[in-house]
From Swiss-Prot:
Its EC number is 4.3.2.1. PROSITE patterns: FUMARATE_LYASES. This is Argininosuccinate lyase. It catalyses: 2-(N(omega)-L-arginino)succinate = fumarate + L-arginine. Keywords: Amino-acid biosynthesis, Arginine biosynthesis, Cytoplasm, Lyase.
Length: 463
């Protein structure tokens, strides 16, 4: 049994092998582009009429037929199968069934090469807008959580070793800043997505007197591509998006890893609520952090799609090659993954975590994270910082050997170490003072954190 004929089949003497037809077809996934394909075709029909290539009546017939296909698809009445090959042929075939011979005029002065490029750009432009909205909601959620934890202290880490205490809000604000960079990257990428390839033809333009600026305007593009060859072969915009998507996933994955650690009994900084955790099939005591674990795992999918497209594109000569069909599943899955992870993480941060403030307070009281402040104290008294640093290092070593903390030293012991120490050393090394004192711009001091929260909310309002 042979595959059904395609618009290009008149060139061939034999029908395509059914297995090859299945292998070649993209309708199973590029049907996602149908709404954008219909909009692009309607704009193309209007342009054909404007330039006199078809009559206004023919254009109106095409536009109405395309709109009927849209309604059929939305109602679940148009479900093309493998015989269509791709979304473009599926639409063209159905259009001709609906409006007759005039349907065959739609593809005048157009190739599937510029058609699919237009569809993908329209799709990605829309998805970027959705992701930007999600990122702003992600920021709002983090800011709301941070607002309630300005004076909640949490150990800060370097090398996953206790380093200096922080305001929990300051820690959360770091992820707000990461999301801000994600937003800025996507907005820049959107500008490069928003260029129209429609009318570039297969690769060299067309002999018809088309108006590419008109179709670009109708579809909301800022301009048409300046080079037809570049227009049909460019996938930079997909790769750029995958780069930005990968960084979004990096940021979500880093926070996910921290939440997984914080939720463990070894840290016990947070408890997971029932609405955002799962259990074990065999261990009844378990409460598993599946959301952050899945986000951490799914990041690899997006990274893989980026790598796949880079490897695919590096060896392609100009202009269009069938390899480019592989961009869509990678792009679609990356979009779906990023959107799902942003939604899940936003819910998790809004209602899935309860920070254990007593445990956090005990944690920042039980280590040497205030050692830098002892060195700073001496430096403020005129002792060279490096000398102060070395002295405090020796003190920490002694305290570890004696199983006590810096706060446990008597004033006599402090002054025996250096005469510059006074009674105010105890206030200086209290965790809350340690945090409050770091009031330099961008620091974890409470005043700075409140200013940072206000500035972040102002940025959100500006959008």
């Amino acid at each position: 049994m042979s595959a059904p004929p395609q618009p290009w089949s008149q060139r061939f003497e034999q029908a395509l092998h059914p297995a090859i037809a299945r292998f070649n077809a993209s309708i199973g996934f590029d049907i996602r582009l149908i709404e954008y394909d219909l909009s692009g075709s309607q704009a193309h029909a209007r342009m054909l009429a404007k330039t006199g290539i078809i009559s206004p009546e023919e254009a109106e017939t095409l536009i109405q037929g395309l709109e009927q296909i849209r309604q059929e698809y939305r109602a679940g009445q148009f479900t093309p199968g493998i015989e269509a090959e791709d979304v473009h042929f599926a639409v063209e075939r159905r259009l001709t069934e609906l409006v007759g011979e005039v349907g065959k005029k739609l593809h005048t002065a157009r190739s599937r090469n510029d058609q699919v490029g237009t569809d993908v750009r329209l799709y990605l432009r829309s998805e970027i807008d959705h992701i930007l909205q999600q990122l702003r909601q992600w920021q709002r959620t983090l800011l709301d959580l941070a607002q309630s934890h300005v004076e909640t202290l949490i150990p800060g880490y370097t090398h996953l070793q206790r380093a200096q205490p922080l305001s929990l809000a300051h820690h959360l604000l770091a992820y707000v800043e990461m999301a801000q960079r994600d937003i800025e990257r996507l907005r820049q990428i959107r500008e490069r997505v928003n260029i129209s390839p429609l009318g570039a033809g297969a690769l060299a333009g067309t002999t018809f007197p088309i108006d590419r600026h008109y179709t670009a305007e109708l579809l909301g593009f800022r301009e048409p591509y300046r080079n037809s060859l570049d227009a049909v072969s460019d996938r930079d915009f997909v790769i750029e998006f995958l780069c930005a998507a990968s960084l979004i996933m990096v940021h979500l994955s880093r926070l996910s890893e921290e939440i997984i650690l914080w939720a463990s009994e070894e840290f016990a900084f947070v408890q997971l609520t029932d609405t955002c955790a799962t259990g074990s099939s065999i261990m009844p005591q378990k409460k598993n952090p599946d959301v952050p674990e899945l986000v951490r795992g799914k990041s690899g999918r997006v990274f893989g799609h980026l790598q796949a497209l880079l490897v695919m594109m590096k060896g392609l000569p100009l202009a269009y090659n069938k390899d480019l069909q592989e961009d869509k599943e990678a792009l679609f899955d990356a979009v779906d993954t990023v959107r799902a992870c942003l939604e899940a993480m936003t819910i998790l941060m809004a209602e899935g975590l309860v920070f254990q403030t007593q445990r956090l307070a005990a944690a920042v009281e039980s280590d040497f994270a205030n050692a830098t402040d002892v060195a700073d104290y001496l430096a403020s008294k005129g002792v060279p910082f490096r000398e102060a640093y070395n002295l405090v290092g020796q003190v920490v070593k002694t305290c570890v050997a004696q199983q006590k903390l810096l706060k446990d030293l008597t004033l006599e012991e402090w002054q025996a170490l250096h005469p510059a120490f006074g009674p105010d050393i105890y206030q200086r090394i209290a965790p809350r003072q340690v945090v409050a004192a770091r009031n330099s711009y961008g620091g974890t001091g409470f005043d700075q954190v409140r200013q940072a929260l206000a500035a972040a909310r102002d940025r959100l309002n500006d959008f």
